[in-house]
Amino acid sequence: MPEKSKYGRFGTGAPLGMGRWGFIAPELAQFAYALFTVLFILFTWTGLDNPQSLLWERMSMLSGTIALWLVYQLWPCRFVMACRVGYLLMMLGMWYPDTYELNKQFGSFDHIVAAWDQHIFGCQPALLFSQIHNSKIVSELMYLGYFSYYLFFIVTTYVIFFLDYRQLERVTYMIFGGFFACYVIFALFPVTGPQYYYLAVGMDEIAAGNLPDIGHHFASTQECLTPPGWQDGVGYQLCHMMHQAGERPTAAFPSSHVAIATLVMLIVARMRMWKYLIFLALPYLFLCLATVYIMAHYAIDSIAGLFTGLALFLLFGGLKLQKV
């Protein structure tokens, strides 16, 4: 009888590499998303700036996955598996801004989402939050909370790797499946977020509740507002560094930060890793608040992210990976 997992209700798990030809489930999720984007590119070829380059980028990214898979066939050990998963994590930094290249041909739907905020709250929470709570302490808590996003999916992946290796494939499948599900939404429903939309419309217009359709404005510009808060703070500087590295006018609805963090919290709770769950609790709270505070998201984006994370958990958590 197989040994029971120390942390679990995910069952005992199975040896890693149970997918077809030895690919692990998160790699298969990446292949599926890559196929979606290839078909997307082919069907929208004339609306894209450089479709040939986009196809080449996919070949390059997937070739790294295949190369590490080949190494694992020759040297099947945990170190190489850690590299395979690490490469997938690194490639998220490529897939995320790539959604901008796919969706900018459609124009922005910010006016719709901002109108939802206006209708529900009677104001623009992203505009007022940082104005009302403008102390250095609040600013640092918000930015450190926002930066803790990487704690949720990167650190958690390797916590599982070291504490419960047998669960690694299933957990990473859920996390990467969650990311790619969000990226599909981003490609089909472009929303840039307040930091871009507010600047394009004008702060006075936003404050007055005027939320016009700006069409394809962001197809030719990536200019955004300077994020609010204490600019000399460590958290602010960390987030600014990440923003400069890969932020684009895309991926606001739903908030993938909230969706993935919620998904991870549910995974950790289901695995009964209570100490780790308590450790994540405050960063999770500040992360959810920070998405609106720093003007990365409308309030409705974060609310939608919460429900998206729950839906992803119910979807992927109920699936059992089968040995092929």
Show the residue positions of the predicted features:
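Membrane-embedded catalytic cores of phosphoryl/pyrophosphoryl-handling enzymes
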Residues: 232-324
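Central hydrophobic cores of alpha-helical transmembrane segments in multi-pass inner-membrane proteins
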Residues: 60-73
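N-terminal transmembrane-helix/juxtamembrane module of multi-pass inner/ER membrane proteins
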Residues: 2-60, 79-153
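Interfacial segments of alpha-helical transmembrane regions
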Residues: 82-87, 154-190, 195-208
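Membrane-interface capping segments at transmembrane-helix boundaries
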Residues: 4-7, 75-76, 318-324
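Membrane-interface helix-boundary motifs at transmembrane edges
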Residues: 48-52, 72-84, 160-171, 272-274
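Membrane-interfacial catalytic/cofactor-binding modules of polytopic membrane enzymes
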Residues: 188-270
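Aromatic-anchored segments of alpha-helical transmembrane domains
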Residues: 35-44, 91-96, 179-187, 282-293
